[in-house]
Amino acid sequence: MGSYVPSSAEEKKSMLAAVGVQTLDDLYASVPESVYLKEPVIPEGQSEMEVISKLSGMVEKNTVYKSIFRGAGAYHHYIPSIVKNVINKEAFRTTYTPYQAEISQGILQSIFEYQTMICELTGMDVSNASVYDGASAAAESIFMCQERKKTKAVISGTSNPEVIETIQTYCKSRGVPVVIVPAKDGQTDQAALAEALTDDTACLYFQQPNYFGVMEDSETLIQMAHDKKALVVMGVNPIALGLMKTPGELGADIAVGEGQPLGLPMSFGGPYLGFMASTKKLMRKLPGRIVGETKDARGGRCFVLTLQAREQHIRREKASSNICSNEALCAMTAGAYLTAMGPEGLAQAAKLCLSKAHYLASALAGIGYTPVYDKPFFHEFVTKTPIPAADAEKKLADKGILSGLPIGENEMLWCATEMNTKAQMDAVIAVLKGEE
């Protein structure tokens, strides 16, 4: 506990003497009094009961919706109780990076199993131990595709706007040119894409399903990019992968996505995790930690951090990225979730999302909230709103329902997951019809 105990009076006196002053006021003599804090930095200490009471009052200011129909990157999914029980184990709740394999086999094995499941989910050869979130995973993947004469990144305009902004921010600092391909009828405009794909194109990034919930023509987009010898980065929803073809089966080179649906609560925006997986050919360009399986001195199975020459503790500023230890707990949460659900459970969750979203879309269309895009969708979709979208949002909020996300004056992006009951969806219709 010594490191948590403030310096004693004698220690302070000794330190002041070492720099040639007698008091703290002497030490800060060069600081103008006009910038001095007049109030204490923190209040006086309080009892545990007083602190809990104060924090409870702060929490009560939040609006917590039990009925949620909003996605747009963060999704309300059921989290099996076993997931929390596993990750709350003291051995996992640490920010320590497991460099010393001989004392970290439990954490290393857990991360290895997470990587294995991400590879199975995406159909790829190798996965890292995750990065900060889905947006940073997408941006990092762009750098994996860079070559000396092929640097341009082509991004589908149907991608999540926040992901696009993150990619642009990352690429600006490295001088990587970015071209945004416009949307057409809710999908990537293939004619515009054909123009954007030139000989200097390093990669194409698109999402499946895209921001509007619409399913893209993945095979065509991938073929168009490969015809120009560009790599393909596919942003995917991990729950949707319970039903759809994997990026590996479709021919993508890199698969990335937001891992929040895999057992992480929405938590006002974080912490989340970004999963990344690629073909073996691109393995050495993957950022972040990679755990590998090997044999110990006795020939037994063991786990280590492998391919470490890519990382910042060896290559410093030339490392492929600067990903720190905090993501390990989120990755292990996703691993625990995938283990608890299994392939059949994940497929069942995906089927429920699909069926409930289509039920909601049909019910909304019946009261004038018609689909904007007549295209296949998974669990998100855009509707027109006969009243301003902000007004529809408020009507539902007044009844304790979080509506879809207004994305235009008269357009709303809806989402339904396995958490939404028929009664909740019928309540949405009743409120919008003015029956409640």
Question: Which residue ranges define each predicted feature?
Answer:
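Short loop-beta-helix segment that forms the pyridoxal 5′-phosphate
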Residues: 99-103, 119-139
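Compact, charge-rich alpha-helical regulatory domains located at protein termini
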Residues: 1-37
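Active-site C-terminal subdomain of aminotransferase-like
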Residues: 262-367, 371-374
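Conserved C-terminal alpha-helix-loop-beta "cap" of PLP-dependent enzymes
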Residues: 344-427
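N-terminal entrance/gating region of PLP-dependent enzymes' catalytic architecture
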Residues: 33-112
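Short acidic-aromatic active-site loops that bind/stabilize oxyanions
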Residues: 101-111, 127, 131, 207, ...
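Buried hydrophobic packing segments
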Residues: 115-118, 122, 137-145, 334-338
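Conserved PLP-enzyme active-site core in the AAT-like
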Residues: 2, 15, 106, 136-299, ...
